[in-house]
Amino acid sequence: MSHNFTESYDIIVIGAGHAGVEASLAASRMGCKVLLATINIEMLAFMPCNPSIGGSAKGIVVREVDALGGEMAKNIDKSYIQMKMLNTGKGPAVRALRAQADKEVYSKEMRKTVENQENLTLRQTMINEILVEDGKVIGVKTATHQEYAAKAVIVTTGTALRGEIIIGDLKYSSGPNHSLAAIPLADNLRDLGFEIGRFKTGTPPRVKASSINYDVTEIQPGDEKANHFSYTSRDEDYVKDQVPCWLTYTNAESHEIIQNNLHRAPMFSGIVKGVGPRYCPSIEDKIVRFADKERHQLFLEPEGRDTEEVYVQGLSTSLPEDVQKDLVHSIKGLENAEMMRTGYAIEYDMIMPHQLRATLETKKISGLFTAGQTNGTSGYEEAAGQGIIAGINAALKIQGRPELILKRSDGYIGVMIDDLVTKGTVEPYRLLTSRAEYRLILRHDNADMRLTEMGREIGLVDDERWARFEIKKNQFDNEMKRLESIKLKPVKETNAKVEELGFKPLTDAVTAKEFMRRPEVSYQDVVQFIGPAAEELDEKIIELIETEIKYEGYISKALDQVEKMKRMEEKRIPANIDWDDIDSIATEARQKFKKINPETIGQASRISGVNPADISILMVYLEGKARSISKNKEKQNHV
């Protein structure tokens, strides 16, 4: 079939949400000519749901995106109205940063970045069709019948694919925030042979700030101590005049209103068909599932400095508008609240992610990548993490360079992608710290140590940032060596100081590092014995040193597990393997192998329903095949 291409690009990204902007920025910064196509330019990097970035596990993803050279962390550091470190009373593995965003500023700042990026064209247009020939992407076709050539296409359409908004018995075609739905593109993906799922998410009502009685709610201020998402941000730029959030609760009256109107709730009347998120359920779902709970938390979150809109976090609903008003007015502090926007549910198509490789390229079509909610995830941060990986790998593919696959031990982004492509998902996927088996080495404080070198090799970390990183890494390494080399001996003067600080005296000589392993001993305590470092250390480096030393035993065990898994990941499975040729593996394992087509022994071992015996049989089979190929080569060489 002949095509009339009017423009040509290396990569075309469809959708300018949080996945799309990261994908397009990464690819263009790597030297590719990129088109970022969006249905509505005004919604670039928009926040149709909660006005925040970060949180448990998610905040670590934002730092990983930053370490690789992405934009989300820098952008939220320019647009937050409140910053808070979560789980400070718990161990370092679960600590994470969360920022309340000024959603308009966030979107505008990201748009400035996109518009000023070299090699990147931003255009408002609707893509209706992905053009494919001989199993390869060749371009796209727009709603206005324009055809653009491309070597790779990245689909990051969020909830727009055949999107439908639902409020009570009202249901209409729409993308997020009442934008246009991408129906022809959804049809096109089905026609291309992809297995499509149907998911659902939702959003709560927004209320007017001046109509809230804050006196009967609990204030939730931000942190005074400076924290940032981006490693490039400076403490002196930390916002001091932060905007508080407020805490209130549902009550018996709220629950009664919901119970009395369940017959009108789309969730229970049969109107909603899509599968909703387990970890962010609607309020009506919570009331039914947790009927024994007397109340549920609700956070009143301002959507920005220059707007009256307040997001009622925890009150996601698709109940009819009149019921929503009664529900809002039953809540303490919201008795006279003016509802500015109605909550709604949105159903949308998504691609079942077992059809993807770990690069986020589809197995079916070469050069076609997908990222974000299109792959069945929920959340801006999960979208950004996938977006940057899809953008990087699309660029690497057309440049003929080795692909980037983040392992589960590299970062939460690696955990997420491996979960998606190996296990799939039957509901909107949300990242949790419990999903990561190596979470003690995937911390908020060490994302740069884990991933900056990768970002540099790819070409996304510039010279200035690399120089700063090298200084930090050298300072960290040098101080760790110093702490290992200096010994504290149990002599009278030393023990006198030890006891003066309130610690048990030394009985044997120990290194400064060993002394610091004591739970009660801080880095500053140790400095009193050995003196300060040659260079003054930043507080963040000191925190990193303390964590690495105090949790060294656990970290060491985790790294041993990583090495074992690495050996399994290095054992590749041929792409053309005939799974029916392998005798003795269980029927369930054979079915799963055919469906997912794992690329390594490590990936195969993580598929649900596959047991160790199946893996052993698979390894024996592959070793036998390798020997057979080797013998055939020897025979040919003798001929």
UniProtKB/Swiss-Prot annotation:
Name of the protein: tRNA uridine 5-carboxymethylaminomethyl modification enzyme MnmG
GO CC annotation terms, alphabetical: cytosol
Classification via Gene3D superfamilies: FAD/NAD(P)-binding domain, GidA associated domain, C-terminal subdomain, tRNA uridine 5-carboxymethylaminomethyl modification enzyme MnmG/GidA
Function as written in the Swiss-Prot or TrEMBL entry: NAD-binding protein involved in the addition of a carboxymethylaminomethyl (cmnm) group at the wobble position (U34) of certain tRNAs, forming tRNA-cmnm(5)s(2)U34.
Cellular location(s): Cytoplasm
Swiss-Prot/TrEMBL GO biological process terms: tRNA methylation; tRNA wobble uridine modification
Family to which the UniProt record says this protein belongs: Belongs to the MnmG family.
